[in-house]
Amino acid sequence: KSALSGETEFLNRTVRVPWEPLRRVLRMNRIADMKGCNYSVARSSLLAINGFDEEYEGYGREDTDVELRLQHLGLEIGSLKGVALQYHVWHPRREFTPVNDTRLEELKRSKRIHCRQGLTTLTDAEGRDLASKI
């Protein structure tokens, strides 16, 4: 119902295309950037970059930060469009927080892999380290 009423964005991401040659022809295996709403990464890789950078404020760029640091680590970003289906409900877009754009540009220049405020700084209610539980 959501797709018919126009509430679903990116309807092309809801179609399963299991045949790799057709996915190539349709350019489904190319990505502009990694979206935080639908991706997976090996635990060891996420730990190596210290997860999401908690220094980002407001809206936007934190998923691109993860993508860049994974690439700086030497990983190639791939796409599962047509294989891992995604339903994205429409919502109004928010403005990106300008300080996040600045932070992302600095990351591009520095080629940094590990963030300061990531998994290793997370604690539970009793103050115990959470990174070791991931």
Question: What feature does the model see in each segment?
Answer:
Residues 1-31:
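Short, flexible, basic/aromatic active-site loop/helix in glycosyltransferases
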Residues 15-16, 111-134:
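Intrinsic low-complexity, glycine/proline- and repeat-rich
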Residues 33-50, 56-76, 81-82:
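A short, conserved alpha-helix in the catalytic core of glycosyltransferases
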Residues 58, 92-95, 101-102:
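Composition- and surface-driven signal marking solvent-exposed, interaction-prone regions
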Residues 63-64, 88, 125:
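Residue-level signal for alpha-helical context at structural boundaries
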Residues 69-73, 90-94, 110:
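Short amphipathic alpha-helical patches
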Residues 80-97:
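Active-site donor/metal-binding and catalytic loop motifs
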Residues 83, 97-122:
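Catalytic core of nucleotide-sugar-dependent glycosyltransferases
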